[in-house]
């Protein structure tokens, strides 16, 4: 009981099969949120990194609709401010802005630049 109160169960949708069965996934008791992995999803759809394609948008629309119907928080990995604004308007409620490795690389670059000065 304590684990349920202090845990968050987020399912990740990263392939076309996940999109197709999103409603069934959301029927599972205990899911707290859905997170879309856009890079893997676009590859699975055969349109690697083509996030403005109709096929990718249709997949997102299906996920968005299912999450809205189930009042399920929906997140995605996105660092572009313009796309974040559009995604927020369409129904996404949380965003992963970067990855741990990106933060580490950028910080290391900053330190090296400062050391050279």
For each feature predicted by the language model, list its residue ranges.
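Expand to "…catalyze enediolate/carbanion chemistry for C-C bond making/breaking, isomerization
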Residues: 1-117
């Amino acid at each position: 009981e304590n684990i349920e109160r202090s845990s968050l169960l987020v399912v990740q949708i990263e392939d076309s099969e996940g999109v197709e069965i999103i409603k069934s996934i959301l029927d599972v008791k205990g899911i707290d949120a859905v997170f879309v992995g856009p890079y893997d999803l676009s590859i699975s759809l055969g349109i690697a990194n083509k996030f403005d394609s109709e096929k990718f948008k249709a997949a997102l629309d299906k996920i968005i609709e299912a999450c809205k119907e189930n009042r399920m928080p929906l997140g995605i990995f996105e660092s572009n401010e313009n796309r974040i604004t559009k995604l927020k308007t369409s129904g996404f409620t949380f965003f992963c802005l970067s990855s741990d490795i990106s933060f580490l690389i950028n910080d290391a670059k900053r330190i090296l630049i400062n050391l050279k000065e």
